[in-house]
Amino acid sequence: MTQATPKVKICGIRTLADAQVAAQAGADFIGLVFVPRRRRRLELDLARELVEGLKSGPGGAPPVVGLFADQPLEEVNHAIETCNLDMVQLCGTESLDYCRDTKAEVIKVMHIPGSPSPESEGEMAQRIKAYRDSGCIVTLDSLVEGLQGGTGESFDWSIAADLAGKGNAFILAGGLSPENISEAVATVGPWGVDVSSGVETKG
């Protein structure tokens, strides 16, 4: 049985002011993008200043998550140490060994195809279990060619609902916005939700 109120991760934060607003609004995780060639990517020095400012404020701060995709492990671990990241979200094809060697708690993204077969759904459940058994939190996101996370597109929620109904805890991502997030939570029953492009105005 999933919790009534899912955890909320706000991703793609680029300024201290936005991070503070998200934290004050009750976000459980703050996400910063470090994936090359992504519109919301932050340089390490700016990210470090943002994290320092957020964590030095009154009342503490939610965990800060750095987003990466198929980048060298040394680069990821350097960013963790430089920016004082609490967690990382790995949006590519990173292996279990890669996750284990990361110097922070890991959120591992699994991309869901538009029309998976029953066999592939079974494989997804096995992969979720494998990553969770290794200490990772799992995120389910839509599969869009050429994009790794932050697609702005949803997938068939019945697939996620079926996985959740079988006891798989995960964060739901992909095209979530203020207009559809309540329906998504009611339909799927996820452990958490990840909103990014759906709450943006510009940039």
Stretches with model-predicted labels:
Residues M1-C11:
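N-terminal amphipathic alpha-helix/helix-capping segment at the start of soluble metabolic enzymes
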Residues G26-A27, N84-L85, G135, G189-P190:
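A structural motif
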Residues C11-R14, R39, F68, C91-E94, ...:
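Structured beta->alpha junctions
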